[in-house]
Amino acid sequence: MQEIEYSFSPEIAEADRPVVLESRIYREWLEASQKKFVVTKVHFSSVDFLRKGRQPLFIKLTATATLPDGRPVHGIVLVRGNAVGILVVLRCEGQKYLLLVRQPRFAIGEQASLEIPAGILDWTGDYRKVALSELKEEAQIDAEESELIDLMDFWYQGKSDGFAASCGLLDERIRLYAIERDVTPEQLRAMDGKDQQYTEEIEWIRTEVLPYEEAARQFVDGKNLIALFLYERWQQSRK
């Protein structure tokens, strides 16, 4: 394996540098990259840490890398690791609804971005466990693992952990699931408009229940649309 020459921008503290190099998200990115590319240098431009635990959340780096035949490739990467997303489909009196969340998304200038419940993969690497945790945390739903419909396994037949969110910059792959629930009108109303505040993570979340088609036409978040597409293909495959 090619030895890598490392460098760090001055703003990354000396004490944090070993933490970055040993972080799960960096090691997993590097391992995957070295299977297909020759990496000779990595310069770390900046690192954002989790507010609790001092683990890297985002790692901005520039690598010097080539294809095996020596052709150079663009090496700017924002490393953040993988994530999960869950499409929650509710059936009530013959109609379908989606249980979604709204939250501020500063990067796209949205105070209340409409999204499926989602979250980053934690140190366990257990996608299903994280999916169930996010359903509870964001959507206030207690679900069993047996309820999860693995849309990635259905579509990729075990060949990929998820779809690439922004393959020109991010290493992130998002694994998508769906769950289906039959609910009463009272339960449907109770799921709408629930507020969650997680000040340590700077998250302000409100649930929103919308008719299936109405919700779909409001989506601008890519993972929402892909989850919807895969769910509908999964449904078609069962007919």
Language-model features, listed with the residues they occupy:
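N-terminal leader/linker segments that precede catalytic domains of diphosphate-processing enzymes
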Residues: 1-115, 120-133, 141-239
